[in-house]
């Protein structure tokens, strides 16, 4: 079943909005929440196979339903995922920290911002 899902993941963009949203929410949850590395990496791999332009729009609309952005551990997992998807999504994810009173969230955003600068200097 795993091969069928990953080979057909690109078909999600052709599903109805309700169905595609449920699939993306589930993949977001598994990409950012669990501690089981296989679930994290498999979900990220599936998401990375989708059109980043389409996916960025979906994620921005759905992330708060699947990921506890106010938890620093889940927020870091979300930034890791965003880094894989696109610079636009990562920038948006980093900007979320502006509204946080949690110093660990702010620190995570700063860490990823520094990584962006470092990666562009290479």
Protein language model annotation of sequence segments:
Residues 2, 35-36, 70-71, 101-106:
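Short inter-helical turns and helix N-cap capping residues of alpha-solenoid HEAT/ARM repeat scaffolds
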Residues 3-17, 40-53, 73-85, 107-116:
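Structural detector for internal amphipathic alpha-helices that build alpha-solenoid repeat scaffolds
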Residues 8-13, 26-45, 59-64:
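Short charge-dense sequence patches
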Residues 13-14, 29-33, 48, 67-68, ...:
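Alpha-solenoid HEAT/Armadillo repeat architecture
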Residues 17-30, 53-65, 87-98, 119-122:
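Amphipathic alpha-helical scaffolding segments comprising HEAT/armadillo-like alpha-solenoid repeats
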Residues 60-65, 71-77:
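Short, local alpha-helical segments
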Residues 97, 101-122:
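Short, intrinsically disordered, low-complexity segments enriched in Ser/Thr and Pro
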């Amino acid at each position: 079943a795993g091969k069928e899902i990953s080979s057909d993941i690109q078909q999600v963009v052709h599903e109805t909005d309700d169905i595609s949203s449920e699939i993306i929410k589930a993949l977001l949850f598994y990409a950012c929440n669990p501690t089981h590395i296989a679930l994290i990496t498999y979900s990220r791999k599936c998401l990375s196979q989708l059109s980043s332009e389409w996916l960025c729009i979906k994620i921005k609309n759905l992330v708060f339903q699947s990921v506890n952005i106010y938890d620093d551990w889940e927020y870091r997992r979300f930034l890791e995922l965003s880094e894989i998807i696109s610079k636009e999504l990562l920038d948006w994810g980093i900007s979320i920290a502006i509204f946080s009173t949690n110093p660990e969230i702010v620190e995570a955003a700063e860490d990823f911002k520094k990584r962006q600068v470092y990666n562009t200097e290479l």
